[in-house]
């Protein structure tokens, strides 16, 4: 379970790459909340937590502008959810029974599709004089487009289950979606999925 957060992120990336960007009517239809946890963890045994006041950002585009203006709002949503489940926030991480980290990933993705503009195979075979097959024709128009997706990852890290200076992630939640629309609409959708991560984790309580 030490690499639970990383495995979850990789799995999500593979899953979402098979879904984007077609098959839905609105950007909200692409929003998803995914959670995973250590089935051997006793979440009722934890009592206090600490959480940094900033989000760690990662991007696959070196020119991406990382905006921290919503850090406080996102961290507050995460903090409130843990408090609602009976945990107490402390300022000193050394006295906390678990640490909460929040990370954000931004990806520029490229996809394409081939437009089969001919009507049927009869048209294709009859296109070349004499009906002979020509390996270079007809031409299939290829459309290439880019879209930006983002993920906010919450990791719940036990401070008592360390070994070889490695931490143990006992719960992870990911809010994923397309980064389209106004900044406020994007943050509203992110917060909705963050809340959903906790809703679908009923075992996560003191």
In which residue ranges do the predicted regions lie?
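Post-signal peptide N-terminal segment of mature Sec-exported envelope proteins
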Residues: 28-45
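N-terminal segment of the mature soluble domain
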Residues: 54-103
């Amino acid at each position: 379970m030490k690499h639970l957060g990383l495995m979850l992120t990789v799995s999500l990336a593979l899953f979402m790459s098979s879904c984007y960007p077609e098959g839905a009517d609105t950007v909200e239809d692409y929003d998803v909340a995914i959670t995973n946890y250590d089935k051997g963890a006793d979440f009722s045994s934890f009592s206090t937590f600490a959480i940094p006041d900033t989000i760690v950002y990662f991007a696959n585009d070196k020119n991406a502008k990382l905006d921290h203006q919503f850090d406080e709002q996102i961290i507050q949503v995460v903090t409130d959810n843990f408090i609602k489940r009976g945990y107490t926030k402390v300022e000193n991480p050394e006295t906390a029974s678990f640490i909460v980290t929040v990370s954000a990933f931004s990806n520029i993705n490229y996809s394409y599709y081939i437009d089969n503009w001919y009507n049927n195979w009869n048209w294709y075979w009859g296109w070349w004089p004499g009906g002979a097959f020509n390996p270079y024709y007809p031409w299939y128009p290829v459309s290439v487009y880019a879209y930006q997706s983002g993920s906010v990852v919450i990791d719940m890290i036990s401070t008592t289950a360390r070994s070889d200076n490695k931490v143990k992630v006992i719960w992870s939640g990911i809010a994923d979606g397309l980064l389209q629309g106004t900044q406020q609409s994007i943050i509203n959708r992110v917060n909705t999925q963050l809340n959903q991560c906790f809703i679908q984790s009923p075992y996560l309580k003191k």
